[in-house]
Amino acid sequence: KAFPQFYVTPYLMLADKNKSSNINGLNQLFRINKNNKYRTGIDVQENSLADIDINQISVLSLVNISDLISKIENSEDKILNLDFEKCIQALSDTYNKDKYYGSSLKFEACKKCEFKTNENSDNLKSGFEFCFTKQLNWNANDFKKPNIFEIWDVKSFKKFKEDNALFLSEITEEHLGGVKLEPNKISRTERQWIQVQKSLNQDNISYLLKEELKSTMSSWCPPFNFIDFECSTSPLPFFKNQNPYQEVSFQFSHHIYHENGKIEHASEYINVTQGKFPNIEFVRELKKSLQKNKGSIFMYSNYENSVLNRRLEEIENSNEVDKNELINFIKSITHPSRNSSKNWQPSRAMIDLHNVVKCFYYNPHTKGSISIKKVLPAIFKTSSFIRKKYSQPINKIDVTSSNFPDEKIWLSLNGGQIIDPYTTLKPIVSEFSSEIEFIDENEEISDGGAAMVAYGKTQYTEMSELERNAIKKSLLKYCELDTLAMVMIFEYLKEVTK
């Protein structure tokens, strides 16, 4: 309406996964910045772009979205029950006046609400609590009651909403679609119902299918190998010939649990060298490490299997001299991805410890989660064996480390409460606070997402070696703890099946 004489054709400019960069460091030409209002913007490195033909390096493609825009303008697709212009006015007014709009609650979204707070939220308001107070009249006591959003892996909240059953005390097996049992394992719905019952009864005793777990473990072959990967994906490629969102495998950690009980941090790999594409070297180093013994290999979730399947495709399309050896290695320890047209039978398939926990073990302290970062602290609370062992320096309990001192103690207390080992990993700036300006003071390597961001930072040319090494050191510690956590979980399962 501002320019009625124009005919506008709308496009989105998107990163095209079918294109590849023909220069190194395309990502460095565009920087994300944040202003004091927590808004993000882009700084274009104009000096760097001056000598580059942007049309030649572009990994972007135009996508015509006329049909989608037409549906919005004609009010075929609506956010609110208003036509397009009135909707824009209403949303603008709501934002400018900081009003609560009061959209109807969608429980699937409420479960994942990004505006929940916890004890570390520094007096921030909880958007979750605000909505439920406004719309459902919940009071402070209601928020303390066990509710349906705590239940693991709920696929639909339709039945809960229809019956207005929001607290665990109000639900029945029917709300879970009925509890369906499966032989020799804890089924999904059985696990959910166990969680509900233990929460209501304030029962913190773990549930274990001991004989079934014992039978499964009897097929495992020592020495036991535990691996964890860290990877990065970016819409703007770091390297020449890399596609947008092409995964970069830059790190792994490898622990071995020997038959005599010795726990060895056997190897690790990390490549944060600016401008060096690490994917194939990553596989070579993993092959070198895992082929030193013939024992069972453990991952935690199917992530490592998926990563190696993607590396397999890259290697198959490469001209590497050891191409066949690397292909055979990957196929020996992985299953084909679900969407793969190829098929092979691994001789030494990786074992998913996440799936083992899911099928045979439930710990109420996890509140339904099977995340390694929830299972490990829960086991610390549950197992006197694990507590006693890891209350000692690692050099006293036959545990080696590549990144922690011999006197490192993994289990510590604060006011009688067990401290989550992951929270003991310090932010990278704590060691170099006065010397590092490139790293945000609020960032720390605390999960895979943070590791991915940290790797992206190492690919900027102006980062000093001091800064790059600080990130590298923190990444190594974090990844080593991940595989050690797997060992601890394995030790616990071994102990409870005696």
What would you call each of these model-derived segments?
Residues 1-498:
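DEDD superfamily 3′-5′ metal-dependent exonuclease/proofreading module
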